[in-house]
Amino acid sequence: MVSESVQARIDKLLNEAREAVAESNWAVVLNRAQNVLRIETENEDARALLAAAERAFEMPS
């Protein structure tokens, strides 16, 4: 279990990542998801966002 302040930081990063998804800003999604996973390695939301960003980078434009 993480502290309240750490959880607030995780929530902020995840919200920023979700906003970036809406803008197709995959570099930000990737960055924010990786930051969450550095704090909480098993965070499922961050893992899903990271996977989405990685798929987006693999797609031809």
Whereabouts are the PLM-identified features?
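Alpha-helical segment of the N-proximal tetratricopeptide repeat
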Residues: A8-N35
